[in-house]
């Protein structure tokens, strides 16, 4: 298994604001990425002779033993997506955020949010190797529901031909996190206005069996719903 190295800030990933919220432990980054569900990828695309940035949500997964030093982040996409073609061999930015609470300060200035957030910057690579691509797609499925890929039929050639995977090295990354209540000015505290925070939690409902499904939800789905 890959031995993780500390997060080493680069000119592109150095945290300049809220440095006290910066996370230096790469293992914490890995744990956060394993928990989060949605990534946003930013890339510059060209249309009608003009370039502009786009940021799009995507399913993702990480492989700490992947082909890149410090692991690989895989982003799920479609071969028909223009942003994915534009990302090939380009530098992209992938962000992942989980909102953990709303912070009510005693002034508008000190209202905030509790969160965990990661930024990964690096050269993107469209995965062409069939073995790596299938492995990455299995990881994406298992990131949603652990163990699910082993219960599914093999993907058809048509399905694989329509599906693309983008690989981004995990080496150049940063993470920030905030927790707890507001940090208010003493005079605002003395004024008597309420301050505090509202914790937010991700909660899953009971699995809903499809009308054409046979039997109840399988164990992997039930376990996943219970763990969210």
Label every model-predicted segment.
Residues 6-75:
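An N-terminal domain-cap segment
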């Amino acid at each position: 298994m890959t031995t993780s190295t500390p997060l080493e800030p680069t000119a592109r990933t150095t945290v300049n604001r809220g440095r006290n919220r910066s996370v230096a432990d790469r293992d914490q980054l890995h744990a956060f990425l394993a928990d989060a569900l949605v990534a946003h990828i930013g890339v510059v695309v060209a249309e009608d002779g003009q370039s502009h940035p786009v940021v799009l949500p995507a399913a993702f997964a990480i492989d700490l033993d992947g082909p890149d030093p410090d692991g690989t982040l895989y982003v799920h996409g479609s071969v028909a997506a223009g942003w994915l073609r534009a990302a090939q061999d380009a530098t992209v930015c992938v962000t992942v955020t989980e909102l953990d609470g709303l912070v009510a300060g005693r002034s508008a200035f000190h209202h905030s949010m509790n969160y965990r957030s990661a930024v990964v910057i690096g050269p993107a690579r469209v995965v062409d190797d069939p073995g790596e691509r299938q492995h990455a797609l299995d990881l994406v499925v298992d990131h949603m529901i652990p163990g699910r890929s082993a219960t599914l039929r093999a993907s058809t050639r048509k399905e694989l031909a329509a599906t693309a995977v983008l690989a981004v090295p995990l080496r150049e990354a940063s993470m920030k996190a905030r927790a707890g209540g507001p940090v208010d000015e003493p005079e605002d505290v003395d004024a008597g206005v309420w301050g505090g925070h509202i914790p937010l939690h991700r909660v899953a409902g009971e699995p809903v069996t499809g009308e054409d499904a046979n039997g109840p939800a399988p164990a992997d789905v039930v376990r996943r719903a219970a763990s969210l």
